[in-house]
Swiss-Prot record:
InterPro entries: Amidohydro-rel, GlcNAc_6-P_deAcase, Metal-dep_hydrolase_composite, Metal_Hydrolase. PANTHER family: N-ACETYLGLUCOSAMINE-6-PHOSPHATE DEACETYLASE. Belongs to the metallo-dependent hydrolases superfamily. NagA family. A divalent metal cation binds at residues 143, 211, 232. It holds the Pfam family Amidohydro_1. It catalyses: N-acetyl-D-glucosamine 6-phosphate + H2O = D-glucosamine 6-phosphate + acetate. Hydrolyzes the N-glycolyl group from N-glycolylglucosamine 6-phosphate (GlcNGc-6-P) in the N-glycolylneuraminic acid (Neu5Gc) degradation pathway. One of its GO terms (molecular function) is N-acetylglucosamine-6-phosphate deacetylase activity. The lineage of its organism: Eukaryota, Metazoa, Chordata, Craniata, Vertebrata. This is N-acetylglucosamine-6-phosphate deacetylase. Its cofactor is a divalent metal cation. Substrate binds at residues 154-155, 235-236, 243, 269-272, 328-330.
Length: 409
């Protein structure tokens, strides 16, 4: 924890000649950083009568909040759902490699697995601050096993579960301690799901609806019970129907609690979601859209077979299938690619595309005071981008942690 006294004595960095994303607008302003946080320059000038200790010219580039990926199953040969004696080293490798894609924080995601896998893996993935070693870990996302058999997608049917009479006790028996967990994806049509949603949210865990055949009413009741997120909208759920739009209908439902914003993940990899579907969702509910990669261990690798939890996926070009099927088995597109594709597919503003990968996931997790923005007092986690939104440099707590060759600052 950075104390005020330590921060006050730290050097002041001034990033100049840049466009910073703040308040939904790209502003031609300087970015001031001290002690790992975004600094208000007026207080520096008028209260402390100080100037910057160091200036860095950004060459007119964009400075945006660091990307946050709340659904990533692994990457670069690492499978988060594989129970080993040293899960941490794999998480560290992925965290390090994500820096080149502008990701400063992420939620390692475990797909449906037997209880012994959760019991072994979860204690090995603690919440961890980011830095030169890699992107920060915000908590684990547990996707399954309490999901629909019909909409299980890439999840192995043998390990799917329903809630027993003592529902939350069953959750704890399956997962073990939830200290390192920040999101749980479940199907709201399962019996006793609302009891579980209430228990999870009481512990500060976000509940996401997904891999589900729920109708709209069941989804609305789940949100009224505390659910706040939808896992990869359109994928692994009932298709939109005009008489019952299912979970998709939450985007425009008038039955949600007053002031409640439902967030929803979208895989904008050019494979999982048609551009027209991206446009429909964004135009219906832009402030809730959260870009996710749903990346699998094959991210960053070539064609061939790779693991995903208890199954294998086969990569063919830009597509990952469950081996021997035509069922999609996650994505192999990193977050910066998803941001660029989303921008092109929807025709939205650059600001909107960047906020979908930063501010919105931070808001969904309740971290918007420290992550996902360049507001004064927020963590100085940001990405430097050129006009085509290619990553030039990544900073965590104001420290340069990755830089493209021949790029600055």
């Amino acid at each position: 924890m950075r104390s005020g006294q330590c921060a006050a004595g730290a050097p002041v960095l001034q990033f100049t000649n840049c466009r910073i994303l703040r308040g939904g607008t790209l502003l031609r302003e300087d970015l001031w950083v001290r002690g790992g946080r975004i600094l208000d320059p007026e207080k520096l000038f008028f209260e402390e009568r100080r100037v910057a200790d160091e200036q860095r010219d950004c060459g007119g580039r964009i400075l945006a909040p660091g990307f946050i990926d709340v659904q990533i199953n692994g990457g670069f040969g690492v499978d988060f759902s594989k129970a080993t004696e040293d899960v941490g080293s794999g998480v560290a490798l992925v965290a390090r490699r994500l820096l080149s894609h502008g990701v400063t924080s992420f939620c390692p995601t475990l797909v449906t697995s037997p209880p012994e896998v959760y019991h072994k893996v979860l204690p090995q993935i603690p919440v961890k601050s980011g830095g030169p070693h890699g992107a920060g870990v915000l908590g684990v996302h547990l996707e399954g096993p309490f999901i629909s058999r019909e909409k299980r997608g890439a999840h192995p049917e043998a390990y799917l579960r329903s809630f027993e009479a003592n529902a939350f006790h069953d959750v704890l028996a399956t997962y073990g301690p939830l200290d390192n967990v920040c999101i749980v994806t479940l199907a709201p049509e399962l019996d006793r799901s609302h009891e579980v949603i209430q228990a999870l949210t009481a512990q500060g865990i976000r509940v996401s609806l997904g891999h589900s055949v729920a109708d709209l009413r069941a989804a609305e009741v789940a949100v009224q019970s505390g659910a706040t997120f939808i896992t990869h909208l359109f994928n692994a759920m009932l298709p939109f129907h005009h008489r019952d739009p299912g979970i998709v209908g939450l985007l425009t439902s008038d039955q949600l609690p007053p002031g409640h914003c439902i967030f929803y993940g979208m895989i904008a990899d050019g494979i999982h979601t048609n551009p027209a579907a991206l446009r429909i969702a964004h135009r219906a509910h832009p402030q809730g859209l959260v870009l996710v990669t749903d990346a699998v261990p094959a991210l960053g690798l070539g064609n061939g077979r790779h693991t995903l939890g208890q199954q294998e996926v086969e990569v063919d070009g830009l597509i990952a299938y469950i081996a021997g099927t035509k069922t999609l088995g996650g994505s192999i597109a990193p977050m910066d690619v998803c941001v660029r594709h989303f921008l092109q597919a929807t025709g939205c503003s650059v600001e909107s595309a960047l906020e979908a990968a930063s501010l919105h996931p931070a808001q969904m997790l309740g971290l918007e005071k420290t992550k996902g923005s360049l507001d004064f007092g927020a963590d100085a986690d940001f990405v430097v981008l050129d006009d085509t939104l290619h990553v030039q440099a990544t900073y965590i707590s104001g420290e340069l942690v990755w830089q493209a060759e021949e790029a600055g600052p």
